[in-house]
Amino acid sequence: MATTKSFLILFFMILATTSSTCATLGEMVTVLSIDGGGIKGIIPAVILEFLEGQLQEVDNNKDARLADYFDVIGGTSTGGLLTAMITTPNENNRPFAAAKDIIPFYFEHGPHIFNYSGSIFGPMYDGKYLLQVLQEKLGETRVHQALTEVAISSFDIKTNKPVIFTKSNLAKSPELDAKMYDICYSTAAAPMYFPPHYFITHTSDGDIYEFNLVDGAVATVGDPALLSLSVATRLAQEDPAFSSIKSLDYKQMLLLSLGTGTNSEFDKTYTAEEAAKWGPLRWLLAIQQMTNAASSYMTDYYISTVFQAHHSQNNYLRVQENALTGTTTEMDDASEANMELLVQVGETLLKKPVSKDSPETYEEALKRFAKLLSDRKKLRANKASY
């Protein structure tokens, strides 16, 4: 896991130094990345609803959807579920869920998904309801049918390797054209919370592939932004739609990364004296919390540093609440009271400044992003018409 992240970091540091091309809006590659976090996915859902509303307002089109504006949408765990909801087509080949439908989905299904199984030795939740509702909502849709490029991560515990589901890699790896509900359950199957997911796929050549998957956070440690950028880079190099991009650099990337919130005390903090008394189980729980928090911080640090170094800091926006308290820190508290609190967290976050050094609020930054996304979409459409 550390090796994979180190490779991605090195890859993007090298990429950032290879070109100083001045990009036009029409040549930009747009990326949306959504973190994992269980029921805390309500927080980025609030942000997505606001952004989609802004896009509809800017383009005077109530049917505008996020998938119309982003070249790559990536997510892990609950972020993978959100990715599927806004990219899976309905019978009219439009996203089956608008951004405003996501929060009601959590309120309706969250309490049933996080319904304690009562098992002492198995996972906390049996996952049956989650798989059932995913099958009902996503049907038989497969990766290749997604309305834009997706990047949803999981981890195969049999091969001990990450599995990344994307459209652009299907020509080389047709076995990855799995059903979206299998992918969504797999990326959400957090160890200790849900059982791992087994399924098979068949290729046109008759080959059978089996998967034994758990939560995508095992592969991406909760924040899929680097993964999403990697997929976007490959897409820009291989997709004819981006043929005008001769040499990709960060001036040609527009990245929106949505977090699911961290504790005001950087998740839970401990003293050396306290930790010295822990056994293996206590350490296991603490390490998971520490790893997720540290990874989210470091990923943001790496990406923001590179964007700033190439004078493209306005092309990257990380939306994250770092002051969660009480029940809002829990990924599996699906009580109505806590979900209402999470909605309030998201709404309050919109009014907060992006950083201590800037008076710009997240709401203002998202409006700016909406304008960029709209302008870029129009420029590309005009170019395609000639």
From Swiss-Prot:
One of its GO terms (cellular component) is vacuole. Residues 1-23 form the signal peptide. Pfam families: Patatin (PF01734). It comes from the Eukaryota. GO terms for biological process: defense response; lipid catabolic process. It is found in: Vacuole. A motif (DGA/G) lies at residues 215-217. A motif (GXSXG) lies at residues 75-79. Residues 321-384 form a coiled coil. A motif (GXGXXG) lies at residues 36-41. Its EC number is 3.1.1.-. Keywords: Coiled coil, Glycoprotein, Hydrolase, Lipid degradation, Lipid metabolism, Plant defense, Signal, Storage protein, Vacuole. GO terms for molecular function: monoacylglycerol lipase activity; nutrient reservoir activity; phospholipase activity. The active site is at residues 77, 215. Its main location: other. Glycans are attached at residue 115. Residues 32-229 form the PNPLA domain. Probable lipolytic acyl hydrolase (LAH), an activity which is thought to be involved in the response of tubers to pathogens. Belongs to the patatin family. Patatin have a dual role as a somatic storage protein and as an enzyme involved in host resistance. PANTHER family: PATATIN GROUP D-2, XYLOSE ISOMERASE. The nitrogen atoms of the two glycine residues in the GGXR motif define the oxyanion hole, and stabilize the oxyanion that forms during the nucleophilic attack by the catalytic serine during substrate cleavage. This is Patatin-2-Kuras 2.
